[in-house]
């Protein structure tokens, strides 16, 4: 076997792989054939691990095709091919000369690289170049409701047409409302539609960690090429970029490169883009270039539907009245609902008792007691007054100025949503008002949440504060 073996393999790989993929991962490799062992040298651990993970089978297939049973052993190393000791020049045929003169630079002798790689850091090997998309989170097991309807519709559109009109897609809302589920659902749908698509999901802190490792190990160019070569980049909790200036700088350029290439970006945050503190204005501006959608806390009907769906997944019968009992008392987010249901199911399995309202009340007694203690009308009034920088006495007064009337209506709507008090009881707690006044306030706030971004934001922020 001659030194042209790897050249032949490279030529075939160049035919089989997309041009950018070949240039990024295969072209940088150097080769050395010695004692029936073919050693491939990668410039850093990141490239080495990627090649071994993605192309090992293809390389072995080509070696077997060219060598038959005399296939060489294959090794990978980080560094450059060492300079061979001088040997007497052998007699070469014109064909040998032509083959060697046409060999790429990767097969020519270079000075050895003496860089040592820290075993703990493992260079850039820890960069997670797998998709990380959770196959369990799909559109068909996402429970749709009024609170997430627009977000779900936007996510479906993006999955059907990645890199299209909604780029970037920015989903925001409190913890446990389904933003991460939607990210994974989009990723799964894109891959289902196009199996070769390169879709990467990650938490924003992972991006920061990868960048730091790339900087530490002189692999920033590989880092850039990797992140800018994806078909869809899905980043959770973008607010964790706050005050990380170098990460923001790198993400800014990555963001621009992906948008210019019509590659899809989806971001999530716990707040509206312009309200993320510690993030540069130029980034916050770009976050809003596509479509920004709020994911709201689920309303009662959606909470019930979520519980019924999860019970069905566990092959557990959950009576409607039991689902309503739980949903009326746990209002903050989907994660809390699922946790409560898991607890109820576990208790039922341990005791062998049927799941009734009395059983649920017993199984969740500490959680329900905590909720009732935290969310009272008094607590709502104090929280709303503090939020709008007015006095609780203003909420109870007869004043009708908008600066007081609107917070009062919000507080009434929150009392109806977050407590089990009747409309007359809520009216009494707000200065002896009639129950029709409370009903009007609830309907008005529901209407304004559809029409006014500010009211929608205020309502979500107050729900999150009162339910946490």
UniProtKB/Swiss-Prot annotation:
GO BP annotation list: DNA replication initiation; regulation of DNA replication
Pfam family, one: Bac_DnaA
UniProt region (Domain II), positions on chain: 84-131
Ranges for region Domain I, interacts with DnaA modulators: 1-84
UniProt xrefs under InterPro entries: AAA+_ATPase, Chromosome_initiator_DnaA, Chromosome_initiator_DnaA-like, Chromosome_initiator_DnaA_CS, DnaA_C, DnaA_dom, DnaA_N_dom, DnaA_N_sf
Residues covered by region (Disordered): 81-113
PROSITE patterns recorded: DNAA (PS01008)
Organism annotation: Vibrio vulnificus (strain CMCP6)
Protein name (record): Chromosomal replication initiator protein DnaA
